[in-house]
Amino acid sequence: MPEGKIVKALSGFYYVQHEEGITQCRGRGVFRKNKITPLVGDQVVFQADNPSEGYVLEVFDRKNELVRPPIANVDQAILVFSAVEPDFNPGLLDRFLVLIEYHNIKPIICISKMDLVDEKMRETVESYANDYREMGYDVLFTSINTSESIDILKPFLEGCVSVVAGQSGVGKSSMLNVLRPELELKTNDISSHLGRGKHTTRHVELIAIGSGLVADTPGFSSLDFIDIEVEDLTYCFPELKEASQYCKFRGCTHLSEPKCAVKAAVEEGKITEYRYKNYKQFVEEIRERKPRY
């Protein structure tokens, strides 16, 4: 049986990309019975007699799954944050990074609008960028208005399934349109036909850019730590995770415990104070979260 990847799901049809092209498929009735919903990004087994009539027979296990947009098996997230208008926001960036690390997705930090900064702001942003690079993150500088700077991003997309995410007003859609200019019409098309408040569901589609696939809908529209527990949080901060193995107590929360290697690393300047401050804020937020029943 042939295998492929679902690149679009719309009105009960699943569009499966495989070696010979794309086949329009329906899901088997057993999926509904077992409450399995195939998602864009799923690797599947399918059967088809012709390109427009096929059936998805099996959905392979997922390595991760996002709710908004509904997509599975994401390799990386391109996190778009502006240097100015709005100003660079490390607190919000850390929130995105926690969510992405929790879903086992590789983050790539892309700081846009670098063509608009003055010298003082450039120094500030570059200082933050160096901090994040030392933590092990890829950090890129781009200007949405120049295709040359967007070309910096393209090699990172090769062979991967990527989502674009980030704060509002930083040009996520503009970036997608520069990567694939023909998307602009499609974006306008969707927004004119699908109005908010109506009973319509915006579909997500994976679009080919080089040998990579990029979701055409920005990811992580919800920034709440709904599923993350305090004990998970350390593992979403790479530098805290590295230091925590030297804490005296297993399960150390790095707040008030004695002989905490994380707090020692903060005092020694090995972990930045603003990252530790954000960690503590997120712990408090998780602890204040109302329990779900």
Swiss-Prot record:
Residues 63-223 form the CP-type G domain. GTP binds at residues 112-115, 166-174. Zn(2+) binds at residues 247, 252, 254, 260. GO terms for biological process: ribosomal small subunit biogenesis. The keyword Zinc-finger does not apply. CDD domains: S1_YloQ_GTPase, YjeQ_EngC. Keywords: Cytoplasm, GTP-binding, Hydrolase, Metal-binding, Nucleotide-binding, Ribosome biogenesis, RNA-binding, rRNA-binding, Zinc. Its EC number is 3.6.1.-. One of its GO terms (molecular function) is metal ion binding. It is found in: Cytoplasm. InterPro entries: G_CP_dom, NA-bd_OB-fold, P-loop_NTPase, Ribosome_biogen_GTPase_RsgA, RsgA_GTPase_dom, RsgA_N. Pfam families: RsgA_GTPase, RsgA_N. It comes from the Bacteria. GO terms for cellular component: cytoplasm. Its main location: cytoplasm. Its cofactor is Zn(2+). One of several proteins that assist in the late maturation steps of the functional core of the 30S ribosomal subunit. Helps release RbfA from mature subunits. May play a role in the assembly of ribosomal proteins into the subunit. Circularly permuted GTPase that catalyzes slow GTP hydrolysis, GTPase activity is stimulated by the 30S ribosomal subunit. Monomer. Associates with 30S ribosomal subunit, binds 16S rRNA. Belongs to the TRAFAC class YlqF/YawG GTPase family. RsgA subfamily. This is Small ribosomal subunit biogenesis GTPase RsgA. It comes from Bacillus cereus (strain ATCC 10987 / NRS 248).
